[in-house]
A protein has these predicted regions:
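Short, acidic, metal-binding catalytic loop of nucleotide-sugar glycosyltransferases
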Residues: 22-31
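A conserved acidic beta->alpha catalytic loop
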Residues: 23, 38-47, 64
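Glycine-rich, basic loop-to-helix element that forms the pyrophosphate-binding segment
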Residues: 62-82
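Short beta-strand-to-loop acidic/aromatic patch adjacent to the donor-nucleotide binding site
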Residues: 84-95
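Conserved donor NDP-sugar-binding/catalytic core segment of glycosyltransferases
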Residues: 98-138
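Active-site-adjacent helix/loop segment of glycosyltransferases
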Residues: 161, 205-292
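A short, conserved alpha-helix in the catalytic core of glycosyltransferases
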Residues: 164-217
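Non-catalytic, C-terminal membrane-associated alpha-helical segments of glycosyltransferases
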Residues: 253-322, 400-429
Length: 429
């Protein structure tokens, strides 16, 4: 029997998943079996896979879209029950180097204290740039930090990186770890997002090492940088992130965590209100209160709405102008993207010196944190392209601080009670 069961989860990415399977089959070492789980795709993925690869792979067809974690778990249950020593998880839009599986396998064979080993993942369209090489859970700021994100591959990162978790786009897991108390397979009730982070962190809490290996290389598409049609991502990211920190934050940091998480949720909703992105704001609100209520799994359909994210305020500010200037304030990259945006929407607008320009964009870290409001022809702008243009905007910014602490004050008791109620509920599959 081969020691590695490869599980690929696919949803409507026919062309990508065919490339993913092909990359695995081209691996130098052939000690694996491939299982592709199709999450009820409508693009003919399952038929294309069967036609292209026949009995070289096993295609499992779910009757409905079970999400990323549910799709992976369909395959993980099979490879677990068949007795494979290692599980290799791959996203449908990932592709592995010919040595990747071999490098991961031999490392884990030699390092029995390692429960999860991931590839160093590069951007498919910019293969010299790292997408991620593991993640660290930052309990002080209640977020996850991606190691090596978007940095050029210059050899400066260690060959073996110790981390808290690894994204399941290209990761190998020791089968014995899922038998440990509190680990199990992927947390299916996430549906999608933060499921892989929780799984890896569970493995680490069980006493295993979690690493990424530079010699195990993979490419990952990870979607185009375009506006999404609906608020799907907003809902699952916010609900599952909130749930994660409610469950896993060390007891001594619980109160600080509640302030950080609720502060981040408030910032996202207040910013959406300011930008008149009412559907985005409503979805984040649903996500937050669902996290407090312990709502898991697939969201009710009414909570996923048309994405109304926009740059209307900035575009309206630019219209009818003839010239602009930018005060960068050490935010050169943000200024670069602003120039590109202006060129795309108002190509005739010219950049001039501040004294001659009709409007001057002054960069700050975040408009709601800025102590200095704009005056005259100044427009305050931040990296998210939030901009303060008129007296009404200034008034909203002035109300931000009090509104934020009122939101935290009103919700903290309920938040902490909900967190303590759900802690300790991690169960084996």
């Amino acid at each position: 029997m081969n020691p590695i069961g490869v599980v690929i989860c696919n949803y409507n990415k026919k062309d990508f998943v065919l490339q993913c399977v092909q990359s695995v089959l081209e691996s130098k070492e052939k000690n694996f079996d491939i299982y592709v789980v199709d999450n009820a795709s409508s693009d003919g993925s399952a038929e294309a896979l069967k036609k292209a690869y026949g009995n070289r792979i096993t295609v499992i067809e779910n009757k409905e879209n079970l999400g990323g974690s549910g799709g992976f778990n369909t395959g993980l249950r099979i490879v677990r029950d068949k007795g494979y020593s290692y599980f290799m998880c791959l996203d449908d839009d990932a592709a592995v180097d010919e040595n990747a599986l071999s490098v991961l396998y031999h490392y884990m064979e030699e390092h029995t204290d390692t429960g999860m080993a991931g590839c160093r993942v590069y951007h498919t369209q910019m293969s010299d740039y790292i997408q991620q090489s593991g993640l660290l859970i930052d309990f002080d700021n209640c977020t996850a930090k991606t190691i090596g994100a978007d940095m050029p591959e210059d050899g400066s990162l260690p060959d073996v990186i110790e981390c808290d978790t690894v994204a399941t786009c290209a990761v190998m897991v020791r089968a014995d770890t899922v038998k440990q108390k509190g680990v199990g397979i992927m947390p299916e009730d996430n549906f999608i997002y933060w499921d892989d982070m929780e799984w890896g962190y569970r493995i680490k809490l069980a006493g295993y090492r979690v690493v990424t290996l530079a010699e195990a290389k993979a490419l990952h598409q990870m979607g185009a940088n375009t506006k999404k049609e609906n608020t799907f991502i907003n809902y699952y990211m916010w609900r599952n992130r909130t749930n994660f920190f409610m469950r896993f934050t060390p007891e001594a940091q619980m109160e600080a965590m509640s302030v950080k998480v609720m502060g981040a949720v408030f910032d996202a909703m207040y910013e959406s209100m300011f930008r008149e992105e009412h559907n985005v704001r409503q979805t984040i609100s649903y996500a937050f209160y669902d996290a407090l209520a312990g709502v898991r799994g697939k969201a009710d359909s009414y909570k996923i709405m048309k994405n109304d994210a926009n740059d209307n305020k900035l575009i309206q500010t630019l219209q009818g102008r003839k010239s602009f200037a930018i005060e960068e304030n050490n935010q050169e990259e943000d200024a670069y993207y602003l120039r590109n945006f202006i060129a795309s929407v108002c190509p005739d607008l010219r950049e001039e010196e501040q004294t001659k320009a009709e409007i001057v964009f002054r960069f700050c870290d975040y408009i709601f944190y800025s102590e200095k409001m704009p005056d005259g022809k100044e427009i305050l702008i931040d990296s998210e392209r939030n901009c303060v243009v008129d007296e009404n905007d200034i008034e909203i910014c002035k109300n931000y601080g009090y509104s934020k602490w009122l939101f935290i004050y009103m919700n903290q008791g309920v938040f902490l009670a909900a967190a303590r109620r759900m802690r300790g509920e991690i169960v084996d599959e």
